[in-house]
């Protein structure tokens, strides 16, 4: 259950004739799962089965604080601070802090708004509804191919607006390097039209130095969804290209995805998806695994059962051909899966639970 407090703004300002009220909400998601994955590379460079507990299989585990204040005449001020949690060990992610988001925004009804700080890219925002798993589920969707490693960026200014069925996003992230304005900077934009039966989305993302061995990465994507009755059919395409500094690193790719979400009952949802990636490597070394890579494919199946509006049980399975699960060996080890030498594919199955509050 969300906890809310009402705090008066202008406390101690005797000259204020009236004080606005700030609505503060503490919220979070707890998501934990147990997983079995085949053909993982062992420390001795062999092949083995991985059995582990993980966090954030359906949605990333997190806690956060958000606050909003109505300023009058349609104006509104917002702030959000959000931090990751690893449910299997209780730790944070990376350097800690509010890694998932830390931004302050100002908006006006009918105009849209602007947010400042660490936040998601425009492409991430727009394509969330065109993820077959409905929100970039790591079990098992190649999120790295869709949104990239830079799906959150620091020092960002983002414009957002929702005009009925049309949503717009655009952002710029400052690199902050003296004498080199574009170094480490990022930019992007996207739009979505969500009609009653059909939805379409398109987006572009550009970033300098977002991942190791890459000096410039750009991607553009388009997707569509059809909602006939209890089913949602989704298909998308993304092209990415990079300026790289190391042989064997992905320099260009074409990524395709398609799938369906089907509401079997009000509590039960079935998901099926297919993913394919056409990969080109920079200066591959002859006679090595990086020379002429086989284009990977993956099939994903998932079942979600809602225990309540905020509690969910899920089971997921995936099989990847010619790649690690979620194409991790081509997507900069986005989720930590590997593929043992001499193996042609990898399978995974997981059972988990998610609770929102």
Task: Please provide the spans of the model-predicted regions.
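N-terminal signal peptide c-region/cleavage motif recognized by signal peptidases
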Residues: 14-19
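Residue-level detector of the transmembrane beta-barrel scaffold of outer-membrane proteins
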Residues: 25-27, 76-78, 113-115, 167-169, ...
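Transmembrane beta-barrel architecture of outer-membrane proteins
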Residues: 58-62, 98-101, 152-154, 184-186, ...
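Detector for outer-membrane/organellar transmembrane beta-barrel domains
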Residues: 186-306, 316-321, 355
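Structural signature of outer-membrane beta-barrel domains
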Residues: 33-37, 84-88, 121-125, 175-177, ...
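Outer-membrane beta-barrel "beta-signal"
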Residues: 307, 311, 340-357
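Extracellular loop and loop/strand-boundary signature of outer-membrane beta-barrel proteins
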Residues: 47-51, 143-144, 175-176, 243-247, ...
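Outer membrane beta-barrel
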Residues: 21-36, 50-175, 183, 191-199
């Amino acid at each position: 259950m969300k906890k809310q407090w009402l705090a008066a703004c202008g406390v101690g300002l005797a000259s204020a004739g009236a004080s606005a009220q700030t609505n503060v909400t503490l919220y979070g998601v707890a998501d934990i799962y147990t997983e079995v994955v085949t053909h993982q590379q062992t420390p001795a460079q062999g092949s083995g089965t991985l059995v582990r507990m993980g966090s954030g299989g359906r949605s990333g585990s997190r806690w956060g604080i958000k606050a909003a204040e109505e300023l009058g005449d349609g104006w509104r001020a917002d702030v959000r601070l959000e931090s990751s949690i690893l449910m299997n060990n209780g730790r944070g992610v990376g350097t800690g802090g509010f890694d998932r988001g830390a931004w302050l925004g100002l908006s006006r009804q009918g105009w849209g708004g602007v947010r400042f700080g660490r936040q998601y890219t425009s492409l991430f925002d727009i394509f969330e509804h065109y993820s077959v798993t409905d929100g970039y589920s790591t079990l098992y969707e190649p999120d790295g191919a869709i949104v990239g490693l830079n799906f959150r960026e620091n020092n960002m200014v983002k414009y957002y607006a929702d005009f009925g069925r049309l949503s717009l996003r655009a952002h710029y992230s400052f690199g902050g390097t003296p004498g080199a304005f574009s170094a480490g900077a990022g930019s992007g934009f996207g739009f979505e039209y969500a009609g009653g039966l059909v939805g379409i989305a398109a987006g572009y993302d550009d970033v300098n130095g977002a991942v190791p061995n890459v000096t410039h990465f750009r991607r553009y994507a388009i997707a569509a969804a059809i909602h006939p009755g209890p089913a949602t059919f989704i298909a998308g395409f993304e092209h990415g290209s990079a300026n790289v500094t190391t042989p064997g690193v992905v320099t260009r790719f074409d990524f395709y995805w398609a799938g369906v979400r089907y509401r079997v009952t009000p509590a039960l949802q079935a998901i099926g998806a297919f993913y394919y990636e056409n990969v080109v490597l920079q200066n591959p070394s002859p006679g090595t695994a990086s020379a002429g890579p086989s284009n990977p494919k993956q099939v994903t199946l998932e079942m979600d059962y809602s225990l309540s509006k905020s509690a969910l049980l899920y089971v997921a399975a995936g099989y990847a051909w010619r790649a690690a699960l979620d194409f991790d060996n081509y997507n900069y080890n986005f989720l930590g899966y590997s593929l043992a030498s001499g193996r042609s594919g990898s399978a995974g199955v997981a059972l988990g639970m998610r609770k929102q509050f």
